[in-house]
Amino acid sequence: EMRPSGGNRLRLVFYAPTRGLIGYQGELLTDTRGTAIMNRLFHAYAPFKGEITGRRNGVLISNEQGDAVAYAMWKLEDRGPMMIEPGWKVYRGMIVGEHTRDNDLEINVLKGKQLTNIRTTSKDEAVRLTPPIKMTLEKALAYIQDDELVEVTPKSVRLRKKLLDPNDRKREERRKEAETATA
């Protein structure tokens, strides 16, 4: 139900499962440029009504362990927005960004610029990166898929694949495809 609430405001009343509201407050504030106020009240228990669709894009997964390099991240920006900053420690299987397509992509954020002894009159320009997506615990829980986990430490919230090894992930994916084909 939608009705006026005075002072150029609207009041929306709707029923939604709690699992569907995880991560929605941040999205609502973004959509309304911080002007929305959200209040939740328990209405009733209800039977399961089906899956709630999550994100549709894949993720960018680190394929090496080490410190992220700004130059490598700059070269990979066209693949999708990053969730890490240069200098962050990454490991194999860690999610470092969101892919622009619907599949997961293994990337190397450690590859530095090839240096030469040749000097030029034009200096190398400083790499300018798009600010990374900041993950809060609520946002991370809403973001992950079934094959992903959230790591919470006192200093950071990180996302990773359940299976860190890419070969294990491919094997598991093939096994699931075989199960659905026989079912």
Question: Where are each of the predicted segments found?
Answer:
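Accessory interaction regions appended to the cores of large information-processing enzymes
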Residues: 1-183
